[in-house]
């Protein structure tokens, strides 16, 4: 953003400190007006014909802008990915424990990656792993939506569940 002497246009459309239109003035007249008010001349619309400048306290303006940006960054929610590891031959109790953990993560707003690692000859029975992941996603259906269907990657199969937005 250009201020004061950085502005190169000969004529500018001037907006006063309180937002009122002051018309088209020469750059020097606008600079003198801003200096008399102990404020800065700030170029707000460089592509307009003639460019639009506003008389304001630039330091205060920058401070307000930075405050808004900081507030926006603070309000952004960071979604993290939690992983739950299952096996193709998982026992019922272990399955329920993993399921409870996954539901807890989803309720907190995190995504859950459920993965099954096939060891040894178990890779020949991918359909068993597929059934376990399908059962897992159905059990989490109340609090989640399937973001990516079960798919193989190397020796492991995984699916990603995202929390449901009930707002």
UniProtKB/Swiss-Prot annotation:
Compartments in which it is found: Cytoplasm
Keywords: Cytoplasm, Initiation factor, Protein biosynthesis
Cystine pairs: none
A molecular-function term among this protein's GO annotations: ribosome binding
Pfam family, one: IF3_C
SUPFAM superfamilies associated with the record: Translation initiation factor IF3, C-terminal domain (SSF55200), Translation initiation factor IF3, N-terminal domain (SSF54364)
One biological process term in Gene Ontology: ribosome disassembly
A GO cellular component entry from the record: cytosol
PANTHER family the UniProt entry points to: TRANSLATION INITIATION FACTOR IF-3 (PTHR10938), TRANSLATION INITIATION FACTOR IF-3, MITOCHONDRIAL (PTHR10938:SF0)
Purpose: IF-3 binds to the 30S ribosomal subunit and shifts the equilibrium between 70S ribosomes and their 50S and 30S subunits in favor of the free subunits, thus enhancing the availability of 30S subunits on which protein synthesis initiation begins.
Subunit and interaction comment: Monomer.
Family: Belongs to the IF-3 family.
Name of the protein in question: Translation initiation factor IF-3
Species of provenance: Bacillus cereus (strain ATCC 14579 / DSM 31 / CCUG 7414 / JCM 2152 / NBRC 15305 / NCIMB 9373 / NCTC 2599 / NRRL B-3711)
Lineage of the species this protein comes from: Bacteria, Bacillati, Bacillota, Bacilli, Bacillales
């Amino acid at each position: 953003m250009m201020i004061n002497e950085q502005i190169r246009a000969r004529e500018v459309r001037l907006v006063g400190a309180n937002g009122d239109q002051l018309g088209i003035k020469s750059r020097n007249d606008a600079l003198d007006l801003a200096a008399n008010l102990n404020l800065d001349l700030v170029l707000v619309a460089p592509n307009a014909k003639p460019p639009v400048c506003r008389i304001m306290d630039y330091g205060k303006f920058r401070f307000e802008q930075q405050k808004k940006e900081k507030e926006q960054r603070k309000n952004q929610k960071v979604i993290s990915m939690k992983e739950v590891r299952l096996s193709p031959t998982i026992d019922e109790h272990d399955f329920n424990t993993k399921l409870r953990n996954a539901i807890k993560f989803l309720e907190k707003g995190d995504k859950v990656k459920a993965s099954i690692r096939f060891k040894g000859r178990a890779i020949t029975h991918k359909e068993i792993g597929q059934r376990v992941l399908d059962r897992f996603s159905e059990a989490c259906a109340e609090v989640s939506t399937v973001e990516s269907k079960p798919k193989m990657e190397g020796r492991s199969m995984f699916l990603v569940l995202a929390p449901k937005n009930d707002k």
